[in-house]
């Protein structure tokens, strides 16, 4: 599949989707984009910058949601112009899709909305690449129906994203079998390594997380053989206004990406490993 200006597939070198969970300020957006662009250029990893102008799914009504549509899109446009990087952002049921699609390069649908047929159809009908997150409540084989709905719009630029499955209360588990199953649906598969360690509502009025397991799961997904890795990162996760508990410190991204690139190269170029994946 052609994604912006590079080819993506489950057997091609992986690409990265990364950035802060939510746009907190113009400075934070530009700073994280600059650091990530420098690292990915050095490691030759195709990079898509992500951040949200509005986080609709929040544990508490008092939680920070973002800077809003107009300011958020202005900042994303500035990131795109300043660093020449493609942009991904979330859209929701009442998002003015035309306005967002005029700025960003990839649209992302939230996991909780993956079964909403009209929503998925409207987003995919924009003709932009779409990253569809698998619901925490959904079996991986059920995503083939979501792919069919999406591609029925005529849009072939559809990706599937695994972000963990509900495992009792306030917990998620990442089942690597899900990646293998979804790879059979003729769509690039992305693994969300940071939301997969989230503890939804685990802190009462906010979600917790176990960021120490992000590198473990990211390496496991790369070993399975995926098209892309999604990770949220922040210079100071403890001060992040959304999902800090499961965000990777920005200072740790270089080392982790070096590991992932080395493993990805092994899995996708070694003939024996290619047979296993």
UniProtKB/Swiss-Prot annotation:
Pathway: Carbohydrate biosynthesis; 3-deoxy-D-manno-octulosonate biosynthesis; 3-deoxy-D-manno-octulosonate from D-ribulose 5-phosphate: step 2/3; Bacterial outer membrane biogenesis; lipopolysaccharide biosynthesis. Its EC number is 2.5.1.55. It is an enzyme of class 2 (transferase). Keywords: Cytoplasm, Lipopolysaccharide biosynthesis, Transferase. One of its GO terms (cellular component) is cytoplasm. Pfam families: DAHP_synth_1. GO terms for molecular function: 3-deoxy-8-phosphooctulonate synthase activity. Disulfide bonds: none annotated. One of its GO terms (biological process) is keto-3-deoxy-D-manno-octulosonic acid biosynthetic process. It is found in: Cytoplasm. Belongs to the KdsA family. PANTHER family: PHOSPHO-2-DEHYDRO-3-DEOXYHEPTONATE ALDOLASE. This is 2-dehydro-3-deoxyphosphooctonate aldolase. It comes from Dichelobacter nodosus (strain VCS1703A).
